[in-house]
């Protein structure tokens, strides 16, 4: 089984198989999701103090904040699916 890993900025990596959504943090419902995750202890801040540009929601209900654009994360995910970029892939 292949474990696909995605770089979400500043050396932070998440499992591509666990991603449910990659969204922009601008809307009120997403801000509410972020606050609820913070209250539950399920928020992971991977921004290194920079502005949050992407919110990643996983199948385990963790919410991850990233400082890279959602389009960039999606592009990295799509290059993984094509098999053209295998730098961050690990075989189990």
Swiss-Prot record:
Highest rank taxon of the organism: Bacteria
A Pfam short name: RemA-like
NCBIfam families: MtxBflmRegRemA, PRK04323.1
Protein family: Belongs to the RemA family.
HAMAP family in UniProt: RemA (MF_01503)
Protein name, UniProt field: Putative regulatory protein CA_C1717
Species, as recorded: Clostridium acetobutylicum (strain ATCC 824 / DSM 792 / JCM 1419 / IAM 19013 / LMG 5710 / NBRC 13948 / NRRL B-527 / VKM B-1787 / 2291 / W)
Lineage of source species: Bacteria, Bacillati, Bacillota, Clostridia, Eubacteriales
């Amino acid at each position: 089984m292949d474990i696909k890993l995605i770089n979400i900025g500043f050396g932070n990596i998440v499992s591509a198989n666990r991603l449910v959504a990659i969204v922009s943090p601008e809307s009120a419902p997403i801000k509410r999701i972020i606050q609820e995750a913070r209250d539950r202890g399920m928020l992971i801040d991977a921004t290194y103090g920079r502005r949050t540009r992407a919110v990643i929601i996983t199948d385990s209900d963790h919410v991850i904040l990233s400082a890279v654009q959602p389009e960039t994360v999606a592009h990295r995910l799509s290059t993984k699916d094509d098999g053209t970029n295998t730098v961050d892939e690990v075989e189990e």
